[in-house]
Amino acid sequence: MQIEHSMLHLLNTASQTLVCAQAPLPIKEEKTAAFLERKLSKALGARKRKQGSFQENSLFLERLRQYRDKTISFDAFSTWMAEHLYAEKSECARYEDSAFLISEIVEEGRRNLIGIDQNYQSAMTCYPDQEQNNVLYETTVLPNGILKTDFVFVIELSDFTLYVLEEKSEWQGKETTLLASRYLQATTAPSFEETQKVMETVGKTMSEKYDMDVVKVLPKMKQMMKEAVEAQSEIAVAEVAEVLFQEVPYAKDLFVEEVKNAGIAAKVSTAHCRLAKSNKVQKLLADAEIEITLPLEYLSQPAKFEIIEAADGTYSIQIKNITNLKSK
């Protein structure tokens, strides 16, 4: 990751104070660069981020075009973004003390603008002093990572591809991503994590409905998603349906329709997505509270793992070619 520009503004709507940075952050300083890289990397790879699209009349998009075309500087654009966000948060009665980090980076040849609005916490630092004994000073602390309450956006400057990380909140009787809709003037699609949950729920429901083996169907879906994320390729819902429901062809269109009705696009981007550990394994629950956790790829390799159904309807599980066994 190459950090081109970075500025930090204070948006204290609780105390009605806006402090815009007068100088950029010292990105060449080793500790500052390391802190920024950790935080910006987490923003790029957040599993809960949602793909968004700007409305045609978006004021933010208009200013963004001016910045990309170099008619305004990073400092000026950064200050405008801070002032605009402060005004929107005040208008929505979002009274909180936050730091708004704005950075332009180059990652894998792509130039991105990243904004992270994050609540900061107060802390006390002790400085030993020979004359005054121990002196306590109040400081503010920003965490290294991205928190659930943060508002984050990532914009690829070449084509204005937008990703947003924001928890929904109630506004005028509706659950919405408030700052994305008001500040960016953009709409958002479900996140990769939400998409995965929807597809797994629909897949499980339809497997049970058509008397298919759920133990085989869900791991297949998880494996396809895992491979797509590792390759950073799109997930086509129709292709997933084709693989899952080979035995029940008429279920393919129903699966695609149910997923579409849940608000999921026909093709799902996996750009910058990272898999949680739980998405790399499959848990099997059996009688007598037996739980088996296996790597996903094992379920498609009969030489390593097999489920055998007996004539009386019971199952046997074989884990094969094990060279080492430990109690954990």
Regions found by a protein language model. Give the residues of each.
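C-terminal structured domains
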Residues: 242-328
